[in-house]
């Protein structure tokens, strides 16, 4: 069963933890790719200098952040990569959760082809570990791009999160990655990951 709007309608820090262990589903050419969410980061526009919406900043690019909970916010970085976020709390609040890493579960060969243009069995150990262990890596592997920006995970048939009951794990809370510019916000312990999971991007 997919997660509903009510599930997403909560503080981004709470949602970021509760998404761990849930399963992201992405349909590509009629094939469903599945991956367990193992690492997330929370962003809260009102108080978070690392957020694209800090201080109420509102542009065409950041408009999805102000959307309904459960909306996808997909943005472009470094001129070639995408990052995938899910909006939380309440419409107009500009809170969201970055999906940082997945553990591949189903149709791993297609995931591998999308990521490396190779069958999974052809990958070396380094490639296998890095197949979905980072926000842009998982977007490549699950074919998530600007076409998915604004997509409603509560209604979409091709991108959503399943309420699968994987909860036998310990959650690590630590600092977020790549936000040294964000002054005091760089020290917020708003990154969450499943302890000892091999697909976490940074430990």
UniProtKB/Swiss-Prot annotation:
It comes from the Bacteria. InterPro entries: Formyl_transferase-like_C_sf, MPG, MPG_sf. Keywords: DNA damage, DNA repair, Hydrolase. CDD domains: AAG. One of its GO terms (molecular function) is DNA binding. The keyword Hydrolase applies. Its EC number is 3.2.2.-. GO terms for biological process: base-excision repair. It holds the Pfam family Pur_DNA_glyco. Coiled coil: none annotated. PANTHER family: DNA-3-METHYLADENINE GLYCOSYLASE. Belongs to the DNA glycosylase MPG family. This is Putative 3-methyladenine DNA glycosylase. It comes from Clostridium botulinum (strain Hall / ATCC 3502 / NCTC 13319 / Type A).
